[in-house]
Regions:
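Conserved catalytic core of the tyrosine transesterase superfamily
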Residues: 2-311
Length: 311
């Protein structure tokens, strides 16, 4: 950016007002693209944090200021994950400004994101999950709508590997009973079709036949899962249901994402194609799915070391 154009972002010439206006437009653009509310909120928080820093230090939006801001966060104890998230937010914002002709160039183009030490996801054993499903099935009696709903929810999360937010958003019209397919709306409002097996099919049918009518009200939405008050089940409630059920697994404390991790890993353990698993999980990049191959290899190594006489 040239010296004359830098003044556009100088705090002494109304630059902060321009940046705040740009941020408002950027957030509107994210919303229009169907970016999740949580991502919008995180971007808003991180970029506002930068704007406060620029205001406090009377700096312009340039590479040096961005590095100073990230250094300050690091010195204050910010983790690599925090720095990576904030860097991503800023790079998206400044790239959008440049593409929208609100800036002559992108000051974050040379800004590097810290490499994260990515831990392998936690995976519940098939044996411990079988015990969970057996227990839940015994509680899912015709006169127990809560038990039927809980069983249906957990069966579907594991059967399909879907995100808990995707499950919460499912409507009755998203179910193709004949072909045993679910139409799931994922990140960025992208839709995909997910197959489910006979056990999930049974749990869906029992919930719809016996459980859902018991809690349904005239004002109830068309959502597949309803709370005891006849409302769409929220992500928080589903998280609590899964967490309470998984306490008895080999992992102890775990949430819905553990079921997603477990589904992906067990699919690969049983020979599923990596690209098929990518499609099932709704990952934009195959690299995101590849972490499960590492989990599968580690599980293979562990089994070998425990079972082979010459390990």
């Amino acid at each position: 950016m040239s010296g004359s154009s830098v003044s556009r972002f100088s705090l002494y010439s109304g630059g902060m007002q321009n940046l705040n206006q740009d941020l408002a437009q950027f957030l509107e653009q994210l919303k229009a693209r169907g970016v999740s509310a949580n991502t919008q909120k995180a971007y808003s928080s991180d970029i506002n944090d930068l704007l406060v820093f620029l205001s406090d230090t009377k700096q312009s939006l340039d590479l040096e200021a961005l590095r100073s801001w990230l250094y300050r966060i690091s010195e204050a104890g910010g983790s690599k994950a925090t720095l990576a998230r904030k860097t991503s937010a800023i790079k998206n914002f400044t790239a959008w400004r440049a593409d929208s002709d609100l800036a002559d160039q992108d000051p974050a183009l040379r800004l590097r994101s810290p490499k994260l030490d990515r831990p392998l996801p936690k995976v519940a054993s098939e044996l411990s999950l079988s015990a969970v499903f057996d227990r839940m099935a015994s509680q899912a009696t015709q006169d127990n709508p809560v038990g039927l709903m809980n069983h249906c929810a957990v069966e579907l999360l594991y059967a399909t590997g879907m995100r808990v937010s995707e499950l919460a958003g499912l409507d009755l019209s998203d179910i193709d009973h004949e072909r045993q397919l679910l139409r799931v709306t994922g990140k960025g409002n992208k839709q995909r079709m997910l197959p489910y097996g006979l056990r999930a099919k049974d749990s869906i049918e029992r919930w719809i036949r016996f459980g859902r009518p018991a809690v349904e009200a005239p004002s109830s939405p068309e959502s597949l899962l309803l709370s005891s008050r006849g409302r769409r089940v929220g992500v928080r409630q589903l998280y609590d249901v899964v967490a309470s059920q998984l306490e008895t697994t080999n992992l102890g404390s775990a949430g819905p994402h553990t079921l997603r991790h477990s589904a992906a890993t067990h699919l690969l353990d049983h020979g599923a194609d990596l690209r098929a698993v990518q499609e099932i999980l709704g990952h934009a990049s195959l690299a995101t799915t590849q972490i499960y191959t590492h989990v599968s290899v580690e599980r293979l190594r562990s089994s070998f070391e425990q079972a082979h006489p010459r390990a």
